[in-house]
Amino acid sequence: PAPDSSFIRDP
């Protein structure tokens, strides 16, 4: 999985 997905969260 992409590392960016790790920091993505719901606002």
Curated annotation (Swiss-Prot):
One of its GO terms (cellular component) is extracellular region. The keyword Transferase does not apply. Keywords: Neuropeptide, Secreted. It is found in: Secreted. Its main location: secreted. One of its GO terms (biological process) is neuropeptide signaling pathway. Signal peptide: none annotated. Belongs to the FARP (FMRF amide related peptide) family. This is Extended FMRFamide-10. It comes from Lobatophasma redelinghuysense (Gladiator). The lineage of its organism: Eukaryota, Metazoa, Ecdysozoa, Arthropoda, Hexapoda.
